[in-house]
């Protein structure tokens, strides 16, 4: 079996908004990497034994006395090092160079003129349509390197930044003031590939097939012949987790699907058909709509609704788990960004905006071991694994759906009547987006039930009924988002269908709020 962790890159995070993007780009090349805080110890680096190290960008200034620094061992480990933006600046400072606050800050596109030859820039411009002497890049910096460390050479410059890239070829140390990880930088992925594959010598073994083989082997080694329980929601993470476990241990996997009454139209039946009938998984379906709605009576505050939904889910899951007396392990669809977020929260710097629906767990007395086969994977990698395991692309590429489901898309108190109306309206919205070839052009689209009544006219009579809001956004990372500029005729068609086909809806509105200041979900 291929050792997918034999060659690996360590990325030290100095706080850049793009740091996770660096890791995803390295993974796309086919090499495993991990993301650690900048203040890691020498012992931890030695234990990880990286094939190469990348220093990320960050918001701090190297001219400040207490700004973050890379561990000195990074430059004594005998492996190649690439510094990006702040990472280049701290490399220069720590190795004897000088950085200063620039009088001309660079944010956005810039043209880098290539200077002395460097392995980092080899064959970047194989495409004959691109220049052989310049690179179009994305800059985001206020400081700049003004004096090189000993044995370094300038490999790139801009009109306002004389040292935009540098290298010490003998020690295989490289720095770039721009961000190769963002798509705005042309040839950025090829630059990272030069570093990871050609300079560090990593083999590209991080593929979907190898990851599946490794995950199955590790599950077998971890749980042996024991039985495992998994909460299956039908979402991407739990679905891929279920199929990996099923491949590894077969009928020893018990999936519990809790139908809480807060799902999309016909979603419960679709989950059972997909995983029970098609894939042959052992699934227990729990009809718990009444239990959830009873617990949610009178609760209209969003955070209280989330907490209640989470608590009831744990209680329902606990009741089913008690019936399976031989279960020794709990499986969860934890993915790598969850691991990173959890680690970051321990620093005390995190500010809670909304509680995450996966936070929490089963009662302590259950004493189950934890199986998390996706904890090394980013979301896009999970989708690739799912595709390789046979899940349909349309399911894997569905828009995100919140853990509390319609519980955060019905504003205020949740009632069955409201959920039923919202389900039908949302199904029409999504159906029309598909028909108009707009579904995959937007990042997320959904309907929201507003518990306010508005006057309308139906035939010769007036009616006083509920309001539905449509929400569609375009985003790269879900940290910021723009409302989608859907065609007016499409919005009109959707509105007419909802008002005519869903009883008790008198008005449809379109949400044109960006993030920030609004969040994507209404609650």
Swiss-Prot record:
Cited InterPro entries: Class_I_gatase-like, GATASE, GMP_synth_C, GMP_synth_GATase, GMP_synthase, GMPS_ATP_PPase_dom, NAD/GMP_synthase, Rossmann-like_a/b/a_fold
Enzyme kind, highest EC tier: ligase
Single GO molecular function: GMP synthase activity
Catalytic residue list: 85, 179, 181
Enzyme Commission number(s) from the entry: 6.3.5.2
Chain residues that bind ATP: 233-239
Domain of life: Bacteria
Residues in GMPS ATP-PPase domain copies: 206-398
DNA-binding found in the keyword field: no
Glutamine amidotransferase type-1 domain boundaries: 8-205
Biological function: Catalyzes the synthesis of GMP from XMP.
Subunit structure: Homodimer.
Annotated protein name in UniProt: GMP synthase [glutamine-hydrolyzing]
Organism of provenance: Histophilus somni (strain 129Pt)
Upper taxonomic lineage: Bacteria, Pseudomonadati, Pseudomonadota, Gammaproteobacteria, Pasteurellales
């Amino acid at each position: 079996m291929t050792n997918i962790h034999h060659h690996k890159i360590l990325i030290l995070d100095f706080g850049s908004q793009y740091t996770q993007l660096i890791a995803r780009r390295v993974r796309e090349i086919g090499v495993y990497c991990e993301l650690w805080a900048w203040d890691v110890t020498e012992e931890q680096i030695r234990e990880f034994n990286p094939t190469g190290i990348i220093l990320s960008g960050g918001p701090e200034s190297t001219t400040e006395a207490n700004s973050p620094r890379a561990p000195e061992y990074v430059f004594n480990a005998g492996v190649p090092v690439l510094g990006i933006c702040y990472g280049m600046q701290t490399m220069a400072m720590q190795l004897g160079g000088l950085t200063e606050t620039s009088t001309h800050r660079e944010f956005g596109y810039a043209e880098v003129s290539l200077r002395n030859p460097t392995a980092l820039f080899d064959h970047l411009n194989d495409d004959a349509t691109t220049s052989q002497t310049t690179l179009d890049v994305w800059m985001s910096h206020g400081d700049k390197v003004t004096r090189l460390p000993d044995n370094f050479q300038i490999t790139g410059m801009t009109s306002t930044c004389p040292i935009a890239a540098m290298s010490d070829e003998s020690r295989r140390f490289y720095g770039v003031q721009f961000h190769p990880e963002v798509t705005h930088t042309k040839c950025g992925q090829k630059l990272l590939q030069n570093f990871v594959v050609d300079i560090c010598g990593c083999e590209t073994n991080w593929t979907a097939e190898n990851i599946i083989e490794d995950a199955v082997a590790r599950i077998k080694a971890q749980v042996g012949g024991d039985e495992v329980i998994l909460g299956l929601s039908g979402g991407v993470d739990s679905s891929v987790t279920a199929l990996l476990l099923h491949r590894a241990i077969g009928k020893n996997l018990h999936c519990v699907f809790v139908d809480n009454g807060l799902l999309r139209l016909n979603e419960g039946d679709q989950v059972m058909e997909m995983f029970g009938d098609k894939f042959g998984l052992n699934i227990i379906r729990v009809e718990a709509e009444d239990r959830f709605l009873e617990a949610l009576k009178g609760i209209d505050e969003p955070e209280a609704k989330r907490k209640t939904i989470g608590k009831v889910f744990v209680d329902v899951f606990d009741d089913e788990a008690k019936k399976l007396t031989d279960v020794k392990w709990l499986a969860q669809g934890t993915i790598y960004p969850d691991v990173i977020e959890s680690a970051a929260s321990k620093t005390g710097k995190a500010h809670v905006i909304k509680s995450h629906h996966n936070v929490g767990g089963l009662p302590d007395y259950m004493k189950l071991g934890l199986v998390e086969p996706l904890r090394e994977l980013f979301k896009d990698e999970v989708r690739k694994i799912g595709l390789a395991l046979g899940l349909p692309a349309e399911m894997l590429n569905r828009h995100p759906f919140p853990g509390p489901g319609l519980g955060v898309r019905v504003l205020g108190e949740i009632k069955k009547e409201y959920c039923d109306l919202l389900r039908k309206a949302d199904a029409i919205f999504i159906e029309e987006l598909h028909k108009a070839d707009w579904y995959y052009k937007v990042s997320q689209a959904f309907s929201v039930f507003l518990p306010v009544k508005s006057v309308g006219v139906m035939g010769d009579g007036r009616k006083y009924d509920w309001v539905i809001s449509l929400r569609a956004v375009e985003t790269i990372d879900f940290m910021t988002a723009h409302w989608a500029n859907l065609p007016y005729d499409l919005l009109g068609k959707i509105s007419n269908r909802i008002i005519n086909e869903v009883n008790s809806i008198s008005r449809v509105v379109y949400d044109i709020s960006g993030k920030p200041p609004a969040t994507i979900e209404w609650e």
